[in-house]
């Protein structure tokens, strides 16, 4: 005999079924399609397809899910049952096939299984159904009483008021729909304006960044120009200081320095003259004559004087004078020394010609109220320098028939006259 075990889905307690329930719970073999039993079918006459149908109807609400393993009762699944028993050996092949098919449907979730509840769970289920039935009957009675008393009926005035209110609500709805459409249009227009504003803002941001870049470049150029301006201002200030300093400097006295060193006259650190006790080289004397020639020519050019009879050509230690009447005549203002120095008539003629040019400058500078007044006189015909302010002695500038001391003294007087001439020209013509 088959053995089937069931558990209560709610309390998970084992159920003990009666014989009739157990026989009805056995899976029935499928009925033949022709309505007749197959040969060898040993099914009992009392088992019909109706019983199978009843068994299927009892499976409504059942679930194929397994009950919880801890044995607790789930309130949400109080009416759900699962077949957990195992089917014993069946004597009929059709019953075995039906059982295998049902098991496959249960496992695949395509069929549900139902089995009876225990007595306590059944009582609990009936109590819940009674409560729901009582609530439903109470609602039904309330509706019935309202219908009888006319509480749900409305008068004509109330219906008219409701219709008027409905029309007002419809008008309000139409107005709100129109407002909604206006709002939508405004939103669309605002969205377009926003998009345009965002595009304009992006363009303005780009322009701002470009302006900042341009500003940075201009600021850098400004700083560079400020640095250059500072440098130029410093250079200008330095130039002004130098200009002011140069204004205080006399170009004549700065270019030609003349002083007396004992019995010798000195021009630009070159001694003009020689003594037996002071041996001055002829190269130094020649250079001193070149400086004196340059000074006399500069003074003449300053006052606009053109020399007559001679043209002064300063060439350092080889300066000379050239006759204006005879181009072949050159009078050297230099000498190479030797025993016949004081017998050199050409050298003496050059020095006398130099005194002639100096006398021409003196005569031109003496003109006017602020004329030049030299401390020593010049006698061109005899080639003498006269001590006008002293004892009136004269000293020859020639070397012929003269001593070194007297010749050197005449040269010193000549340089002193040049110093006075420098001061006069600087005070009158220096701007």
Curated annotation (Swiss-Prot):
Residues 125-248 form a coiled coil. Present in fetal and adult brain (at protein level). Signal peptide: none annotated. Its main location: cytoplasm. GO terms for molecular function: phosphatidylinositol 3-kinase binding; protein-containing complex binding; protein-macromolecule adaptor activity. Gene3D superfamilies: 6.10.250.3110, Autophagy protein 6/Beclin 1 (1.10.418.40). Changing residue 173 to L: Decreases homodimerization. Decreases interaction with ATG14. Changing residue 215 to L: Decreases interaction with ATG14. Increases slightly homodimerization. Changing residue 222 to L: Decreases homodimerization. Decreases interaction with ATG14. It comes from the Eukaryota. GO terms for biological process: autophagosome assembly; autophagy; cellular response to nitrogen starvation; endosome to lysosome transport; G protein-coupled receptor catabolic process; glucose homeostasis; late endosome to vacuole transport; mitophagy. Changing residue 80 to S: Abolishes interaction with GPRASP1/GASP1 and ability to degrade G-protein coupled receptor. Does not affect function in autophagy. InterPro entries: Atg6/Beclin, Atg6/Beclin_C_sf, Atg6/beclin_CC, Atg6_BARA. It is found in: Cytoplasm. Residues 173-243 are annotated as: Required for homodimer formation. Transmembrane segments: none annotated. Residues 17-74 are annotated as: Disordered. One of its GO terms (cellular component) is phosphatidylinositol 3-kinase complex, class III, type II. Keywords: Autophagy, Coiled coil, Cytoplasm. Belongs to the beclin family. Involved in 2 distinct lysosomal degradation pathways: acts as a regulator of autophagy and as a regulator of G-protein coupled receptors turnover. Regulates degradation in lysosomes of a variety of G-protein coupled receptors via its interaction with GPRASP1/GASP1. Homodimer (via coiled-coil domain). Interacts (via coiled-coil domain) with ATG14 (via coiled-coil domain); this interaction is tighter than BECN2 self-association. Interacts with AMBRA1, UVRAG and PIK3C3/VPS34; these interactions are not disrupted by starvation. Does not interact with RUBCN. Interacts (via N-terminus) with GPRASP1/GASP1; the interaction is direct. This is Beclin-2. It comes from Homo sapiens (Human). The lineage of its organism: Eukaryota, Metazoa, Chordata, Craniata, Vertebrata.
């Amino acid at each position: 005999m088959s053995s089937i075990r069931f558990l209560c889905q709610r309390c998970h307690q084992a159920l003990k079924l009666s014989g009739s329930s157990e026989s009805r719970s056995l899976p029935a073999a499928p009925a033949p399609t022709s309505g007749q039993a197959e040969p060898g079918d040993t099914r009992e006459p009392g088992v019909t397809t109706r019983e199978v149908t009843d068994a299927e109807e009892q499976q409504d609400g059942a679930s194929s899910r397994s009950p919880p393993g801890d044995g607790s009762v789930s309130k949400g699944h109080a009416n759900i049952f699962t077949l957990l028993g195992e089917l014993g050996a069946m004597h009929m092949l059709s019953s075995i096939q039906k059982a295998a098919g049902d098991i496959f449907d249960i496992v695949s979730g395509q069929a549900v299984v139902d089995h009876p509840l225990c007595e306590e769970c059944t009582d609990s289920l009936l109590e819940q159904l009674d409560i729901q039935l009582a609530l439903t009957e109470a609602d039904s009675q309330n509706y019935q009483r309202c219908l009888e008393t006319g509480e749900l009926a409305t008068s004509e005035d109330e219906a008219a008021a409701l219709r008027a209110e409905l029309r007002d609500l419809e008008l309000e709805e139409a107005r709100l729909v129109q407002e909604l459409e206006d709002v939508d249009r405004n939103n669309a227009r605002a969205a377009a304006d926003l998009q345009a504003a965002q595009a304009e803002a992006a363009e303005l941001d780009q322009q701002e960044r470009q302006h900042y870049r341009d500003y940075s470049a201009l600021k850098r150029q400004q700083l560079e120009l400020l640095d250059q301006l500072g440098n130029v201002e410093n250079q200008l200030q330095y130039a002004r200081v130098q200009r002011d300093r140069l204004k205080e400097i006399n170009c004549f006295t700065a270019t030609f320095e003349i002083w007396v060193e004992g019995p010798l006259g000195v021009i630009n650190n070159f001694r003009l003259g020689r003594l037996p006790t002071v041996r001055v080289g002829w190269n130094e004397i020649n250079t001193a004559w070149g400086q004196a020639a340059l000074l006399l020519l500069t003074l003449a050019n300053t006052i606009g004087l053109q020399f007559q009879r001679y043209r002064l050509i300063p060439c350092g230690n080889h300066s000379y004078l050239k006759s204006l009447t005879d181009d072949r005549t050159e009078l050297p203002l230099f000498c190479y020394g030797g025993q016949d120095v004081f017998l050199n008539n050409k050298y003496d003629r050059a020095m006398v010609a130099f005194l002639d040019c100096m006398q021409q400058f003196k005569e031109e500078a003496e003109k006017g109220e602020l004329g030049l007044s030299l401390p020593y006189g010049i006698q061109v015909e005899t080639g003498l320098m006269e001590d006008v302010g002293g004892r009136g002695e004269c000293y020859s500038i020639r070397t012929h028939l003269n001593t070194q001391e007297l010749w050197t003294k005449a040269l010193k007087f000549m340089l002193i006259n040049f110093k006075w001439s420098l001061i006069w020209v600087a005070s009158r013509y220096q701007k």
